From Swiss-Prot:
Organism classification: Eukaryota, Viridiplantae, Streptophyta, Embryophyta, Tracheophyta
The protein's name in its UniProt record: U-box domain-containing protein 29
Gene that this polypeptide is encoded by: PUB29
ARM repeats: 221-263, 265-307
Catalyzed reaction equations: S-ubiquitinyl-[E2 ubiquitin-conjugating enzyme]-L-cysteine + [acceptor protein]-L-lysine = [E2 ubiquitin-conjugating enzyme]-L-cysteine + N(6)-ubiquitinyl-[acceptor protein]-L-lysine
Entry keywords, A to Z: Repeat, Transferase, Ubl conjugation pathway
Pathway info: Protein modification; protein ubiquitination
GO MF term list: transmembrane receptor protein serine/threonine kinase binding; ubiquitin protein ligase activity; ubiquitin-protein transferase activity
Organism annotation: Arabidopsis thaliana (Mouse-ear cress)
Function: Functions as an E3 ubiquitin ligase.
Length: 415
């Protein structure tokens, strides 16, 4: 049923809205940065591995919440006054007409006219509203092919393509099925459209497009096909580049995609040639980038690339060993996962292959020996602790390392 024509729409004061969800806050809480969020929204943000304030991107010294009782009281007073003003009727706390979530019956009608930006936007609101809505659409066998046709059609406006990608990113249908649909006939038209969405879309559209690429990278064939598509790796290198406007969410999504496709040996060589290692070095050495997931995925991708000889040479030789410095810097500083990836990289460089002895000097100069001694006693896996022991056996024969053993770290000697 439609809304009554006399129904009143209320404009919500901006400071009553959560900066993340943009909805009226039900339980406002403030972080140590002073910014207030709805408790549920900020909890999801922090549970996702983030340790920064979403609004300011400042590193959080503590993740504790402080209930903003003053704001809660103001919201309650405002809400009560709105209710009294309208004699008990429930006001609509949303922008007028066209923003409400359509019903399932209305969606069934919308599916008959998908080549309309307005209709696609309504479906976006529908799938964003609940898990049951997403499941409802994902079970409609004809729905996904219709979205793929929108993306594939050359004359489709970019706005329609972006909305179709947004829906696909939300409903997460069967990977193999979607991959086969989008990459049929070498996937040319679909990949071209997704690249355009990455190039021309806003931040949200870029992230969604990258996630769809990641999702359809289903097997070795699809990973190679996507990686070899002109422009894909170029755009990914831009996405993980450190600039003033860099966004951690886009970097993380892009790294996840690169990790997925790097399982192919041919793709690893292409990533090395595209200077992915230089980009990773910049991420590791950027003090202001404190996102845990970004660091973990940067190190995981670097670990994968270190399996190739050209990758190891690039890591050791890049900017006089600065990449190795970045790896050592993250030991014990970010998370257990990050430490394990970092140790594996150093073990590969210094113990297994030892193609460049200068890397050992870089590890020692960066206080790597002391950190490795601590790793041995950490809660890292037994395999990683053994790698740390192997590394110390290699490094201990260097005279400068021996000096460290005899002075600062003798009390934690493993031998």
């Amino acid at each position: 049923m439609g809304r009554d024509e006399t129904e009143t729409y209320i404009t919500v004061p901006s400071f009553f809205k959560c900066p993340i969800s943009l909805d009226v806050m039900r339980s406002p809480v403030s972080l140590c940065t002073g910014v207030t969020y709805d408790r549920a929204s900020i909890q999801r943000w922090l549970d996702g591995g983030n340790n920064t304030c979403p609004a300011t991107m400042q590193l959080l010294k503590t993740k504790d919440f402080v209930p903003n009782l003053t704001l809660q009281r103001l919201i309650n007073i405002w809400s009560d006054s709105i209710g009294r003003r309208h004699n008990g009727d429930s006001p609509v706390l949303n922008p007028p007409s066209g923003r409400e979530v359509p019903t399932k019956e209305e969606v069934n009608v919308l599916l008959e006219r998908l080549m309309s930006l307005e209709n696609l936007m309504k479906i976006v609101r529908f799938v964003k509203d609940s898990d049951s809505n997403r499941e409802f659409l994902s079970k409609k066998m004809e729905f996904v092919p219709m979205l793929v046709d929108i993306i594939r059609t050359k004359k489709t406006k970019i706005e329609l393509v972006i909305m179709a990608i947004r829906i696909l990113d939300s409903i997460k249908v069967d990977r193999e099925r979607l991959s086969n649909l989008m990459l049929a006939n070498d996937g040319g038209d679909c990949l071209t459209a997704i690249l355009l969405a990455i190039q021309r879309g806003n931040l949200e559209s870029k992230i969604e497009s990258v996630r769809v690429l990641d999702w359809i990278s289903f097997d070795a064939k699809s990973k190679l096909m996507i990686a070899e598509r002109d422009g894909v790796l170029t755009e990914m290198m831009k996405s993980i580049s450190i600039t003033e406007s860099s966004d951690p969410s886009l970097i993380e999504a892009s790294l996840s995609f690169l990790i997925t496709i790097s399982k192919s040996k041919r793709v690893r060589s292409k990533l090395i040639a595209a200077k992915a290692i230089t980009k990773i070095k910049d991420i590791l050495l950027t003090e202001t980038l404190t996102n845990v997931a970004v660091t973990e995925k940067s190190l995981k991708l670097l670990e994968t690339l270190s399996s190739k000889r050209e990758g190891r040479l690039e890591i050791c030789g890049d900017d006089n060993g600065r990449c190795v410095e970045g790896v050592v810097k993250k030991l014990l500083k970010v998370s257990t996962t990050a430490t394990e990836h970092a140790v594996t990289i150093l073990w590969c460089l210094c113990y297994v292959f030892r193609e460049d002895k200068t890397v050992e000097e870089t590890v020692e100069r960066s206080n790597g020996v002391t950190k490795l001694l601590v790793v041995i006693q950490s809660n890292c896996s037994a395999m990683v602790r053994q790698m740390a022991k192997d590394l110390i056996k290699v490094l201990k024969f260097n005279s400068s390392a021996l000096a460290a053993y005899e002075t600062k770290t003798t009390h934690i000697m493993p031998f």
